[in-house]
């Protein structure tokens, strides 16, 4: 014999909190499509591209320029360590400036990805209101409007 469920046909997702724990601003449909794999891919691309396209070239160029300035006599070499401290500092500064100069490119990648997911629960405003019109959202919006329209007894 087949066992019969006493709970009926509930189609609750296992990853959604119960209705009593959800806020009025929660939209169940928007939580279903968080593309963590694609976000991780964009982060990895940004790290690799910023290193190879900006940080490494800036670092090498600044180190070569600094070594040239020390060799020409425009910068004094350290008596104990030679040109190493100045070249190392120039390399670190070039690396940092190269990474920082690539920030706008990464931001544009995230903005283009956000435009693809508009209304799917991505970005800083995804929890503020429900952009999708699901039945749960409609009933909650109706309940909150009724509760807010009752006059106080004061």
UniProtKB/Swiss-Prot annotation:
Report keywords, A-Z.
Acetylation, Endosome, Membrane, Mitochondrion, Mitochondrion inner membrane
Its subunit composition reads: Interacts (via OCIA domain) with OCIAD1/ASRIJ and STAT3.
What are the subcellular locations of this protein?
Answer: Endosome; Mitochondrion; Mitochondrion inner membrane
Q: Which organism is it from?
A: Mus musculus
Supply the gene name. Ociad2
Q: One Pfam family for this entry, by name?
A: OCIA
Listed GO CC annotations: endosome; mitochondrial inner membrane; mitochondrion
Q: Which residues form a coiled coil?
A: none
**Listed name of the protein:** OCIA domain-containing protein 2
Cited function = Has an essential role in the assembly of mitochondrial respiratory chain complex III. Is also required for STAT3 activation and plays a role in cell migration.
**N6-acetyllysine is carried by which residues?**
41
Q: Which PANTHER family match?
A: OCIA DOMAIN-CONTAINING PROTEIN 2 (PTHR13336:SF2), OVARIAN CARCINOMA IMMUNOREACTIVE ANTIGEN (PTHR13336)
